[in-house]
């Protein structure tokens, strides 16, 4: 297998100018484990810092838009849509980030960046109630960040 970002001259951004614009979609998911009491506070809108889910959605969308600034060899991509959604478990929130574009390269890095930043934002918003008496986070954990779907298709 040949690496596309590295050659004998060093690191490079892959040339995609010759590629055809195609519909691209990627969906990434990840979870944050939280204390059940914290989940309850989020659902009831009682986190002192503010609306946890709205903050996570905004942060995730912004992160998707800035992926090319964060990951050095990613192309700036003209996005057509981003959705950040949440599913609750007893002791976790699962975040899903769906990214869409019509472009020459895929959007999976954007979806992974969006879900990661949304999860980090949730952590930031709830850290006051997640800390133990020593200021540590024995229960809080971000896990299972992954791409669950990637689509590339021609559209007429």
Curated annotation (Swiss-Prot):
CDD domains: MoaC_A
Residues involved in substrate binding: 73-75, 109-110
Gene3D superfamilies, A to Z: Molybdopterin cofactor biosynthesis C (MoaC) domain
EC code: 4.6.1.17
Active site: 124
Annotated pathway: Cofactor biosynthesis; molybdopterin biosynthesis
GO molecular function: cyclic pyranopterin monophosphate synthase activity
Domain of life assignment: Archaea
Annotated GO biological process: Mo-molybdopterin cofactor biosynthetic process
InterPro entries: Mo_CF_biosynth-C_arc, MoaC, MoaC_sf, MoCo_biosynth_MoaA/MoaC, Mopterin_CF_biosynth-C_dom
Reaction(s) this enzyme catalyzes, per UniProt: (8S)-3',8-cyclo-7,8-dihydroguanosine 5'-triphosphate = cyclic pyranopterin phosphate + diphosphate
Keywords per UniProt: Lyase, Molybdenum cofactor biosynthesis
Pfam families: MoaC
Keyword match Aminoacyl-tRNA synthetase: no
SUPFAM superfamilies tied to this protein: Molybdenum cofactor biosynthesis protein C, MoaC (SSF55040)
Role: Catalyzes the conversion of (8S)-3',8-cyclo-7,8-dihydroguanosine 5'-triphosphate to cyclic pyranopterin monophosphate (cPMP).
Family classification: Belongs to the MoaC family.
Oligomer and partners: Homohexamer; trimer of dimers.
Name by which UniProt lists this protein: Probable cyclic pyranopterin monophosphate synthase
